[in-house]
Regions:
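N-terminal secretory signal peptides that target proteins for export/translocation
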Residues: 1-10
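Bacterial N-terminal signal peptides
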Residues: 11-22
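Extracytoplasmic
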Residues: 27-188, 620-760
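Flavin (FAD/FMN)-binding glycine-rich loop and adjacent Rossmann-like elements that form
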Residues: 182-189, 230, 307, 317-622
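Beta1/beta-strand and adjacent pyrophosphate-binding region of the FAD-binding site
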Residues: 189-201
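N-terminal Rossmann-fold NAD(P) dinucleotide-binding loop
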Residues: 204
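Conserved N-terminal/central alpha/beta ligand/cofactor-binding core
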Residues: 210, 216-217, 222-301, 351-354, ...
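Conserved beta-strand-loop-beta-strand element in the redox core of flavoprotein oxidoreductases
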Residues: 299-319
């Protein structure tokens, strides 16, 4: 920890030194990265498009209300006339939209520059701010937002060389930018680590936690200030995919520790638990967490990655992270791309990016600015945002460049949201929404599909539907094959780039047990030390429809982390885990999620607070038999004849569900007991009351050679939802058979569990 603090302090000192040091040479100049402002005010740090435009930038995301100024101080070494250059863009100019919504000013020592910024340029470039007279010494600079509609600023350059603009700065840490920042030619080294995980979403967190608990020294690199990816408070997609089930029901226990419990998507900030996720990661002594670090290239030795270079998105400094194994959990497959891993990307028809949003209603009327630059929408052009939120289907970019034009896709989504809210406030929806306000719009996009890195197995839709078995099948994928397409109803007005989607759910996935995704989808087939987890794993476009949801991605990470520990012990490649150490991996997958060891070769410790082992269908949602008195047999173990339907709608059922059927159908449910010791026992049925249940449900009890018939009332609410059938005096090893029938019933017959309870 001390080393990390000192390292960060040194980088900060160097950056401030180059801003405040006296200027030398024939040309005086000052370069200020917007992200390094001492006070950002209401401006957001946007790191999503560094690969496309070269840098993080500040974004005035105020939902139509100007944000507070960003403020910093800088030093001028000599008085004089300086030309002001600002790297920015007019973010709607590419669509020939009018009014330039992203306007802002530069104010130096209380005086605004002559130019208004955010009004020029389809692409990122230098906007000439004119000549400014500056005095030697400390000066104050402010970014003043004028609109609240996503003005953006990358950097500011002041120079006494007034004739030429600075060079382009589209590449990450270009030579010119390095020179201005005073960065050393060789970055600071971190590591070596057993595993370097790039990407702090569910896949990355699962990989890091799993590897660390199996004794690996891990670096977790995340380009945002929070963890969770699409499942963070910045994007607010609730985490889906059933966990703790299938062949290895211990997989998912780690993800359960960090999962949200959001009631909506998008939900509230608090529901997504950013602080919880960070705390769980930081509590692991084997993990070094690098938030606000954007990986931008790799070093290679043949087919092996030796290091990842990452940019500190707050200071512009760079670190080189050295490791033995690397896990690409970036979603877009960036690490694999730079390493020249085999990959695939559907040329069109991909799933898009969503920017969800929320609104509310106050007690008094509110105003919202007209948005002539947004999409030109009326209320019929979009689905009404019910329950005050715009959901996952606010999605676009299906046939657009999901990598090279990700910023354009995000911006199109913003134009759609603002255009829709403008319709609600200022057009044909105005009469019904006088008090409506925008409360939240995601400026961080939630992408679904781009590159997929190829492994030794490329999983297909046919594999999943046919339930093809692989010896290394492990991660249970329980989401349907869910692919998104433009929704025809709303696609006509903007046919080139529809902004509302529909989900088409395929069949064939067992959503209770899950399809076991093979381990060989989680490592590169041509980069020797590269794992992957998340939506960039080795699957086809169609198969991605089931594996891409976040809890499933997190479970991939759990498998990757354990495989990395086997690689560390045996000094082998990820492929060797399948070919030579598969039994070791499958053994580790049976460990509780909280099992841990200090090093990959140390003894494994299972703590007392480990979760109980779930069954193949996952943790029971109802009452656990182990917590009930007596001998309880659930309907899972009963013998049924006829047609029965499983249900979970009535509370207080035992384990997974109950079953029900209609009267007089000749259907039966039979429960067989062997008495463990002699005594008098009450025979009882667990039965959740409902007005449509039978009051005359027939029950037959067979004991030795005797057969007795009873009738129970399942409509009447009973204590603890248990209905008594009869009492019997029983000998040890007696057999008791209880059959619930339908003949003569006057309502729905309900079958849950049956119990023998010894009467003291």
């Amino acid at each position: 920890m001390t080393r990390s603090i000192l390292s960060y302090t040194l980088r900060t000192f160097l950056l401030l030194f180059f801003c405040f040091a006296p200027l030398i040479g024939s040309t005086a100049e000052v370069f200020i990265e917007a992200e390094s402002f001492q006070k950002r005010g209401g401006w957001k740090l946007d790191t999503q498009f560094i690969q496309q435009m070269g840098s993080p930038y500040l974004l005035a995301h105020g939902l139509g209300r100007p944000v507070d100024d960003a403020v910093t101080k800088f030093n001028i070494g000599e008085s004089g006339n300086y030309r002001l250059w600002v790297r920015t863009k007019d973010w709607v100019a590419r669509w020939n939209a009018t009014a330039s919504p992203g306007k802002f000013q530069i104010i130096i020592d209380g005086k605004p520059a002559n130019a208004t910024f955010g009004t020029n340029g389809v692409q990122w470039g230098w906007h000439d701010g004119g000549i400014i007279a500056l005095e030697k010494g400390t000066n104050e600079l402010r970014l003043k937002d004028l609109t609240g509609f996503d003005g953006r600023c990358d950097c500011i350059y002041l120079t006494t060389e007034t004739d030429q603009p600075p060079p382009p700065a589209d590449t990450v840490l270009s030579e010119w930018r390095r020179e201005q920042l005073g960065l050393a030619a060789n970055p600071e080294n971190r590591g070596p680590y057993d595993l370097v995980v790039i990407g702090g979403g569910y896949a990355g967190m699962g990989s890091a936690l799993s590897a660390a608990r199996m004794g690996c020294r891990v670096a977790l690199v995340q380009d945002r200030p929070v963890l969770g990816g699409n499942g963070s408070s910045e994007v607010r997609v609730w985490a889906k995919g059933n966990i703790r089930r299938g062949k290895f029901p211990r997989i998912g226990e780690i993800i359960e520790e960090i999962s949200d419990n959001a009631k909506k998507s998008p939900g509230t900030y608090e529901e997504f638990g950013d602080e919880l996720k960070e705390r769980v990661i930081r509590d692991e002594p084997n993990i070094d967490l690098l938030l606000n670090h954007h990986a931008h290239r790799v070093d290679m030795d043949g087919n092996r990655i030796t290091a990842v270079h990452a940019l500190d998105t707050r200071t512009g400094s760079e670190v080189k992270i050295i490791g033995d194994y690397f896990a690409d959990c970036t979603g877009h497959g960036w690490i694999g791309t730079w390493a020249k891993a085999d990959l695939d990307m559907s040329p069109n028809g991909r799933m898009g990016m969503s920017n969800m949003w929320a609104w509310d209603e106050l007690d008094t009327p509110t105003a919202f600015p007209e948005t002539p630059w947004a999409l030109d929408l009326q209320m019929a052009d979009f689905p009404y945002p019910r329950d005050h939120h715009g959901q996952w289907f606010w999605e676009s970019g299906f046939d657009k460049d999901a990598i090279g034009d990700a910023e354009g896709i995000r911006d199109w989504n913003l134009r759609a949201v603002y255009g829709a809210f403008n319709a609600m406030k200022n057009r044909d929806g105005a009469a019904k929404h006088p008090n409506a306000i925008l409360t939240w719009v995601a400026f961080v996009g939630g992408p679904r599909e781009s590159r997929r890195l190829m492994g030794d197995v490329v999983l297909t839709e046919d594999d999943i539907v046919a339930k093809k078995e692989f010896p290394d099948g492990c991660v249970p994928s329980t989401w349907s094959i869910d692919l998104h397409y433009p929704k025809e109803q709303y696609a006509k007005k903007y046919a080139d780039n529809p902004f509302i989607s529909k989900a088409v759910h395929g069949k064939g996935v067992d959503r209770s047990y899950g399809y076991p995704v093979p381990y060989r989808c989680f490592y590169s087939r041509n980069i020797d030390n590269l794992f992957m987890a998340g939506r960039c794993i080795s699957v086809t476009h169609e198969a991605l429809g089931t594996v891409r949801v976040m809890k499933t991605c997190g479970m991939m990470g759990e498998v990757v982390g354990k495989a990395a520990s086997i690689c560390a012990i045996n000094d082998c490649q990820p492929r060797d885990v399948y070919e030579s150490h598969l039994d070791e991996l499958l053994t580790l997958l049976k460990l509780p999620g909280k099992a841990h060891r200090s090093t990959p070769s140390a003894e494994i410790i299972i703590p007392s607070d480990a979760l109980p082992l779930a069954g193949p269908r996952g943790p029971a949602n109802g009452m656990e038999i182990s917590k009930l008195a007596g001998i309880v047999i659930d309907d899972e173990l009963a013998k049924f004849t006829g047609n029965w339907t499983s249900g979970t709608g009535l509370p207080n059922y035992v384990r997974y569900s109950y079953k029900y059927t209609g009267p007089n159908t000749n259907a039966t449910a039979t429960f067989k007991f062997t008495v463990p010791k002699a005594g008098r026992y009450s025979i009882e049925a667990f039965s959740q009351a409902h007005p449509n249940r039978s009051t005359k449900t027939p029950v037959t009890v067979r004991h030795n050679d005797s057969i007795s018939e009873y009738v129970i009332n399942q409509r009447l609410k009973s204590k603890d939802d248990v209905v008594g059938i009869t009492d019997l005096k029983l000998a040890e090893q007696d057999e008791v058979i209880v059959t619930i029938g339908t003949k003569g019933a006057d309502g729905t017959i309900h079958v849950d569990a049956v119990r023998l309870l010894e009467i003291e």
